[in-house]
Amino acid sequence: MLFSSDEALSFIFPCNQFGGQAPGSDAEIQEFCTLKYNTQFPQMKKSDVNGANELPLFTWLKAQKGFEGFGSSPAALMMKGMLAVSRPDYKSTPDIKWNFTKFVVDRAGNVAARFEPTADMKDVRKLVEKLIG
């Protein structure tokens, strides 16, 4: 865990909208995340993050921080290429583009940042450290 629970909270919202990467039950997904990523924070029920059935939380998060790009890393170039074929309009919508998109919300409830799955976790950690200062 990056931070103690009194400093920051992290939540996992499994979603099967991205290449069918989370087809299992909530229990199976939790076991996978615990074994593969050593997650030690709450996992919510599998949910939609885009579309007609998306959780209202994600409607709000995306309205606060829309998509700003993937950056220029090799992973970003791969993501851009994949989405250019499967979703040519991907740049023009606030939709979540792929699993592991992260939103940082400060203590006052403001969305401080959106990090795409291509973002370096060091950047996420740096922002959270600044916010919990």
Briefly describe each language-model feature range.
Residues 27, 74-75, 125-126:
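Flexible domain-boundary/linker segments
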Residues 32, 38-118:
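Thiol/selenol-based redox catalytic cores and closely related redox-interacting motifs
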Residues 3, 61-65, 132:
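Sec/Tat-exported extracytoplasmic proteins
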Residues 112-133:
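Non-catalytic, surface beta->alpha helical segment in thiol-disulfide oxidoreductase systems
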Residues 1-58:
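Structural microenvironment flanking redox-active thiols in thiol-disulfide oxidoreductases
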